[in-house]
């Protein structure tokens, strides 16, 4: 029995209660195990908490089951229909029904879903059924406490608990409640048709209390409120009823508080179902409000099988007789009532059979049978036949579905009951009784209806208006809301964008800062810091470069080690051989200081030999010692003396060194260890007691340990010896110059250079001394030779190879600095050179000075001498690895030690640098391609983009420097010579005279030079002359127009001069540059500034001499024609302190090398060289050691001219040199194409940019040339005086020629020039009939290699003569072949053959060329073709002819040429027009139509090109018709104008064609040499200009075409 729990509001709890056992609940589904109704499960259920899977039967008010409530509805409905609504019983029943739905104070009524989920309980839920004759058969049944409708106890219950149970005050007192309950019970019994017991009747009337009678009331509903604990019933159970075995006996679990068995927890009234707690005693703490979705139980009459047995572990068995502590067994309160009743009816009526019990028993048995059958079916053997097994499976599944079907039916019934009940039906009005309507009511109803309608209409309108207002308001709100939202979003977006922008800016700043820091560390050569930053950035490319650098340097280090080891082994072998020979002879001849036997003719016979007195030990050295030649005679005269053994000084040292090296060689892989001297404890540099010797040790160690990029700690950490330290392992300190050097003291940086050169010698290495020009490379070389002679006892022979122009300078320097050194200047005529042979054979000399030419020519003499040292001045001459000089030196001359002197080691290309290194150290620098690829395209192998950014470029440059550092020493003037005055360079723009402007314009546009017509016997009428090499002609015009002889002759005649030479003012008025010089030179002479004036062209120097003579300037001239012996004299004359010569006129190529002209402080470069290094060399003739004044370099440049392009190209090349490398710019395999494009760009018209090309005025020029304020003021005064003087002159002329001064034949408009050009073309076609002058051919008749070879072998003139003969013979042969055929007999096929041939030579075209068309016809053709080419699509603006201009080559599109037999394009058509192949417009039309048909054949129909070709056909037809119509209407004059234009354009196209195709013509001239074709080269060799070269043309060509190679 359950009692109410006051704390938890009556949460039901399991407890022993009388009853027949658990009510079978609905199962969730079929179970494969035994059914709950089986014998097994019925026999042994154990009490415990219910399973969560079993539903709780919902209960009605006061604990009545829900089905009773539904039964109560039936009488209520019948009473309502009979009109008994006023009956008090009806109201009571209605109140009870309402309570079942819930009143105020009991929470809201349950929703239909809740009702549905609660379902309807089984009638077998409790043992106290109305018709049950026995109270209970449980383990402990006894008198119970009855409970009322609210779940409160009827008697003896705690009022407080009751108050808590109902959760609110009640209007009834206890007696009224008892009476009400009794009335309800009585109504139920009456509704079932059962008699009312007497005590119930009395309780209904309120006469007697109810509780004592409760056990005897069979229909009393089970209590619905649980007690505080599962206490036992107070009395023993009457043993008058017991179930048979297997139907629930003592082992059955006692029913729950509401007659619900354990496993089906009851539900408190008016609330949702409550779950059972998990443990047996934990229900006190269980929450009362936790909902649990429950499955509704089976309807009445369908008993469910008993719940399955709960395992003992999950629900411990509760003994039936246990009682809670503190709850004593209460005596039954019913005893007095029993006694009183027994007095009235002493014999109790026997109870009848309860049909419900019988039904229940029947159900149990059915369930048992079903469970048994399921078990049988489950245990069937697996060997059954297939059909039997199928039937058994069907039966088993059907039996398992029983509970599911029952549940489904129950849910259907529940839904039907709910939907048909009075209170829950949809239409409540259907149950009302209709009322009869009277007439008055109808009227009233009508009136009310009208009022209602009016009211409804008003309300509708009002509602509609409110609706509209609400819509409008909503629109406003909507807009406002979205405006605010948009504003917020915009603010947010702006904030986010600002945030990201700030973040990005910060990130960018940080990246820039890191990059700057990286660059700073890179430039500061902080390798460790730079590598750290690279690791932080994770830049793979930079890391890859560094890794490559390390690998390459490691390889080179190993190669250097091997080279040095090989040299040491060679030396040792030689010495052993020598010792063996001496031992074999048995006697030791007089040994010279170099360890070799001496004789009278020995080259060291005049050097002192150290001798020692045997007894006293006195040593005689220097002047006291005997000469090597008279040693034996001296020893005879001075007995007791003998030659001092070398072991005391050099020999022992060298032997020890050899032994040490021998020991060190086998262990090259060991980690580097410091030498013995360095292992000595070096004092702390910061301490005070550091002696001078210690300080020197510290500095030496620091100097040796520090490489260019690696600190020694890093090098040691990596286990690598520093690359530089390996190369210069043997160090020797040089503090002062040799005693043999007199007449001057070396500067400190020159001493350092000497030390580096000595280090190269000691380490068996060769190198490049690349100090900037003017730092004294010659002096340092002389210092090395004297040092080796004095300290190393190496007296030569030394071979010094120099340019002819500097040979006299070298001889002068030797005489000045080392007069004791015996030198031979090997030069002159063959007879003079032969005179030196005896001296050379005797070896009585130390140094031989000679030139490149004689090295090659006289190799049979010079190569026989075993040279100790080979020194090449201007070493960049060796930059071509295949040049004759390099090959001769490598193959014929024996010189283990080599030294190159150069001021420009890295000119333009990387292979050139490799060639120098390969010449010096062939064992280390073997492969050019590896070297070039490593520096040129480091990323070519990785697949990444090859272009390099600035940082990568600097890394590459630095790794190149790193490779070069042991072998190359380069110091700049600004670094080593602080006392050297600065050098300032200005580019001064010069204007053109009117004559220059006219000539320049026509030469640039048409490639023609205007003449006065005298060459055609049309003197005065004017004419044109087509010249080759347009750029060269443009440069000449910029320099001076009188460089063209016929122009000067014509002008001299025009101006009234005789002899064809212009003199006086008009010399400088004709040229802008000369006019500028005329303003500058007087000022420089007035302020005692000596001037070096460098020109490219010797003919210009001649004109300048005329000008100097006119102005009275004293000058000296040196060019390629100046003899070598005269050069020294010229230098001496100019450098004399009181020399009257203030201008030295030099050619850039001949006078730019190796001359000391430091007495001059102004350098004027009249015209720039293509190679900027030539100009730099020229500048450094003045800016060199010994210069006292600030040097001004004035570079003259004509505005808006080709000179500006040359200057730009030179600057670009210089930039390449400064950086050493820019990726991709070295690999100039396509240089011919680039050169062609560059020439074409120069020849095209460009817009004049006046602002940029401003010609400086007098004041600006004065600022450029003045060294200080006083000079500037003087120059300004001189300008003022000059202007005043000119103003006073009555015959005053402007400083530059103007157009009105020019003769009429030179002032021609473009049309006239075109006409004259066309006439000249015609004359060329038909022949002039008179002899023609020999034309100067400015193209190279020889290739670079051939020319260089000719220069080296001295056979230039013979080879050129041979080429000329071959040319003429070939021409004669061609003329004889062409003789029989005439233009008139040539056929169409011949035309095609001619058209396919390319013009193979310059000059006059072949005689068989077709006769020209009439100019008018040519004009028409050009006009038609131009119109077709220029036609554009009106919609897209696209030029249709773009793809038809030039066909792709056969290599690019071979399939086109396979398909199309006669390919033609507009370029070919234009060429045929120029060559007069078309004799009529019909011929032209055929080719244009063929072009379009070819396009239509090759391309798909409907493609863009196909459609374009159709359009072009129609365009051609329409243009032709239009032009023919115009032609008919035009007059004779217009025809003549067209003729002039046509001929002009023809000549223009011819000249451009000739200009652009220089490379092709060079190939053609190669063929003239008997068809010998040399393999093509990626980069052509730069020609060597011989200083003996006297031809002006060669000089000009070198400056023009030769310089294109740079």
Curated annotation (Swiss-Prot):
Residues 1-274 are annotated as: Necessary for interaction with SS18L1/CREST. Residues 74-89, 1388-1397, 1559-1569 have a biased composition (Basic and acidic residues). Residues 571-580, 1570-1580 have a biased composition (Basic residues). The modification Phosphoserine is found at residues 602, 605, 687, 691, 1341, 1411, 1529, 1534, 1545, 1586, 1590. A motif (KIKL) lies at residues 1555-1558. GO terms for biological process: nervous system development; positive regulation of transcription by RNA polymerase II. There is a cross-link at residue 1324 (Glycyl lysine isopeptide (Lys-Gly) (interchain with G-Cter in SUMO2)). Its main location: nucleus. This is SWI/SNF-related matrix-associated actin-dependent regulator of chromatin subfamily A member 4. It comes from Bos taurus (Bovine). The lineage of its organism: Eukaryota, Metazoa, Chordata, Craniata, Vertebrata. The gene is SMARCA4.
